[in-house]
Amino acid sequence: MTGLKRKVLIGTITRNRPIMLQNLLKSYTNLIVPDNIDVSFLITENNNEKTLHNVIAEFQRYNITSEVIYTNEPALGIASARNHVLNYAIDHKYDILTFADDDEQVEPDWLLELLKERDSKNLDIVGSPVRFAAPLDKLHWWKNIIWRGVNQVNQGAEKRARTLYDQGKASKLKLATGSWMANLDFFRLTGLRFDTSLGQAGGEDWQLWQDAKEVGAQTGWTPYAIAYETIPLSRLKLSYYYRRTRDHARMVYHERLKKGKAGRTFGSVLSRIYKVLTSTLLLPLQKERGLITIAANLGGLVGFIEGAFGKKSAHYINIDGN
């Protein structure tokens, strides 16, 4: 603590997305910061060397009252980069850490609303919605179908999360780091970190949430702290959502295997088969959303089977966006 002020570190990890990063940092300049908070920004580039000096310098010019720290993490992998930020926050005696992804932008009250939810319920970890930003350019008809489908799926997920929140059951929601806040005393006490053994498979945020719940973390979610994700055109393909879910399923299988729970995969496979069949039958009604559901569940089905045969995921070797 600094006097009566809490120290908050707004963490960002990034790799090969300078334009998207600029947009995120620009949105940070509009954040509403409570009077009892000291905010610093840490931008960690997941690269052997720093390549973003101009981007960081521009951001610093707009943040004359806040400290801006720029570091790099040479060990490739989202978990390694997130741990770099988490360790920095702990070592430098911050009280609160937040994450938003480098392909996002946040609303001005994003930090305020996360803090409000965390403080009102004394939460260790809290998340919030990441909505999809509307495309800036007119899309090809097929890409527009994919866009509408993924947006409908995302809106449905947020609606279900809001229902649980209204029922007082937000602790059941899996929390990703796209819009995320943590009480650092919890991490000091438990020593929990993101699982670097996942490499570039992804899924380290949900895995951390699961590990945190197992050691007693109080977790929650707020519908009021909004972030917006920009979807690159390269992701507006059914094949992308197939690969993404396939790679995630591979990761889940190997995590279950490590914990002696690989037997649960049989149920997961049956569930995906059921969802593919029902979504195919309901496609005339579900339309765009149904296409995404079919592609994703086919990917999950294949991923669990491939995982059982030893295949692992490296989903984030290739980076979408710029």
Model-derived regions, located:
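Non-catalytic, C-terminal membrane-associated alpha-helical segments of glycosyltransferases
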Residues: 243-250, 261-322
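Conserved donor NDP-sugar-binding/catalytic core segment of glycosyltransferases
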Residues: 109-143
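Glycine-rich, basic loop-to-helix element that forms the pyrophosphate-binding segment
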Residues: 73-92
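Short, flexible, basic/aromatic active-site loop/helix in glycosyltransferases
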Residues: 146-172
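A conserved acidic beta->alpha catalytic loop
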Residues: 42-56, 104
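Short, well-formed alpha-helical segments that are part of the catalytic scaffolds
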Residues: 17-32
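Acidic donor-binding loop at a coil-to-helix junction in glycosyltransferase catalytic cores
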Residues: 177, 199-210
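Short beta-strand-to-loop acidic/aromatic patch adjacent to the donor-nucleotide binding site
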Residues: 93-105
